[in-house]
From Swiss-Prot:
Subcellular location per the Swiss-Prot or TrEMBL entry: Cell inner membrane
Family per record: Belongs to the NhaA Na(+)/H(+) (TC 2.A.33) antiporter family.
Function as written in the Swiss-Prot or TrEMBL entry: Na(+)/H(+) antiporter that extrudes sodium in exchange for external protons.
One term of GO molecular function: sodium:proton antiporter activity
Protein name stated in the entry: Na(+)/H(+) antiporter NhaA 2
Catalytic activity of the protein: Na(+)(in) + 2 H(+)(out) = Na(+)(out) + 2 H(+)(in)
Gene3D superfamilies: Na+/H+ antiporter like domain
Name of one Pfam family that matches: Na_H_antiport_1
Length: 382
């Protein structure tokens, strides 16, 4: 029992859990359990009362609802690190920012270069721009003491800025037709959150209440509802009136739910791809190649080149006692897009099967390639 508890508390466990539920989803979708698996996640669930109801399939409740809590955690983490943590120093924060920029621009350009003549495929240009924090850090932790703390912090910081970039991309490019009334309600909710923050209110139930209303309003507005999580994170106070840490405590309470429940459930709901009738040629289709080359090559090259240029221009500094060889290994791991890439894929193609799920398979291939190559590279290079 003690051994199970120790394993569950280790930093590698979230990554292992994601891998397990990914393979479980693939097993379910490609076996006699396929119909049960599909029907379960497509089953409609209605929440509300007589005159106000929200009805969605289970997979959409996960993708639109639970993932908002994940984005809330990302927002809280970033806010804490910038105001109190490792990113307080501008020199420390500049390297992961440049890396995140390179890791978004380069994969997007590679995807666009391959798919520019296919209008529908081009909707997925942002798919290879994401990094999965839990998976990437989980792989890194498997290497133990071989990786210096400064490099672990760089990867975590870069992944946070990467996810922030993904949030901006979702807001700007994957927003449906807007509803003026719903947006007005969103603004009222934001004003309410501002008041709660201004008066240093630390009753979490009030933030939850306003947050739920904000999430519903955003759902109806046309702006993706998961952004509600980011907005809420901006207004949660750092400390209580007595100067006791508050934001960090909220993050500590939420984090286990995200890494042990929400992300594994998201992986299980979205990684189920039927590959039984898939032709090998579909993996070499333009959309698949764009995703694989963008994630596996574009991410590592983009992150490294942008960081290298920033260092040479003295805009950023390589962590102390770190050589470029080891640093490049971290850049390879940024190609693990997995859950974030699957999420953007769902927004871009609305879960269409026009590509026969070759797009999702490409995400898995690129993510596992980045994980395996990055792990072996970091194991070998000193």
């Amino acid at each position: 029992m003690q051994m199970i508890k120790k394993m569950a508390l280790s930093e590698t466990f979230p990554g292992i859990l994601l891998i397990f539920f990914t393979f479980l989803a693939l097993l379910c979708k490609n076996s006699s359990l396929s119909v049960i698996y599909t029907d379960f996640f497509h089953a409609n669930f209605t929440v509300g009362f007589v005159h106000f109801q929200i009805s969605k399939s289970l997979d959409l409740w996960i993708n639109d609802g639970l993932i908002a809590i994940f984005f809330l955690c990302i927002g809280l983490e970033l806010k804490y690190e910038i105001l109190r943590g490792q990113l307080k120093n501008i020199r420390a924060v500049s390297l992961p920012i440049f890396g995140a920029l390179g890791g978004m621009i380069t994969p997007a350009l590679i995807f666009a270069a391959i798919n520019y003549s296919y209008d529908f495929a081009m909707k997925g240009w942002a798919i290879p721009t994401a990094t999965d924090i839990a998976f990437a850090v989980g792989i890194l932790m498997l290497l133990g003491n071989k990786i210096p703390t400064s490099l672990k912090l760089f990867l975590l910081s870069l992944a946070i800025f990467d996810d922030l970039g993904a949030i901006v991309i979702i807001a700007l490019f994957y927003t449906d037709q807007l509803s003026a009334l719903a947006i007005i309600i969103c603004l009222f909710c934001i004003f309410a959150l501002l008041l709660l923050n201004y008066y240093h209110i630390t009753h979490l139930s009030l933030y939850v209440l306003v947050g739920v209303v904000l999430w519903i309003a955003m759902l109806k507005s046309g702006v993706h509802a998961t952004l509600a999580g980011v907005i809420i994170s901006l207004f949660i106070p750092l400390d209580t009136k007595n100067k006791k840490p508050y934001l960090h405590e909220v993050l500590k309470d939420l984090n286990p739910w995200v890494v042990y429940f929400i992300l594994p459930l998201f992986a299980f709901a979205n990684a189920g791809i039927d590959i039984r009738d898939m032709h090998l040629g579909s993996v070499f289709s333009p959309v698949s190649l764009g995703i694989i080359l963008g994630l596996f090559l574009g991410k590592q090259l983009g992150v490294f080149i942008f960081c290298f240029i920033a260092i040479k221009l003295k805009l950023a500094k390589l962590p102390e006692n770190i050589k470029y060889g080891k640093f490049y290994g971290i850049c390879i791991l940024t190609g693990i897009g997995f859950t974030m890439s699957l999420f953007i894929d769902g927004l871009a193609y609305k879960n269409s099967d026009i590509f026969e799920h070759a797009d999702k398979l490409a995400i898995l291939i690129a993510s596992f390639l980045s994980a395996i190559v990055g792990f072996i590279y970091l194991k070998i290079v000193k």
